[in-house]
Amino acid sequence: MDSPDDPNKKNDPNPQPGNPPNDLGTFAQQFQHQPVAARVPERIARGVFTTGVLVLDSPNEFVLDFLQGLTRPFQIAARVIVVPAVMEQIVTAAGDNLDKYTQSYGLPPQLPKPPQKRPTIAEIYENFKLSDDLLSGAYSNSVMVGHSPSEFFFDFITGFYPTAAVSARIMTSAHHMPRIVDTLKMAMQQYRNRYNPPPNNG
């Protein structure tokens, strides 16, 4: 279905027909869907806690694996799939929210620096359990980020007709947020360098 972006139109339960039906009875209609709130399914409302994020990318999407390394067995608490344009929004929203937190409460306490020898991707996935129900992840086409004096949250949202809904809710401590923001920014920059390199003026 086509969804023209006319901000002056509202959701219409009886939209005007578009193209007339063809010989097979197939037709298309134009409609407006501008959600102002997102439903939170009961199974999502409690959210999951993360201590870090691992980002994988391809030309078409990003995979955000939120890690839970607090108690054993270590596991991937949530997997979220977004397109590059939404990844840009996530990086901006997370960075802006961390800036607002810092203005209100000061810099979050720093975590110890990780060891110099970084594990490979294969080693990480050997140590962090990924359950079968998370293999395909949860899709998101927008995000909302917020904070309290001690925690941050990410609400990943799908804005599909007829009802926008939260597809994943992630929470983390203020201690972990700077490293998460840095990881997201680094992943976005690496994506740009890999798939949209700057023109070579030489």
Where are these regions (language model features)?
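Positively charged, low-complexity terminal tracts
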Residues: 1-202
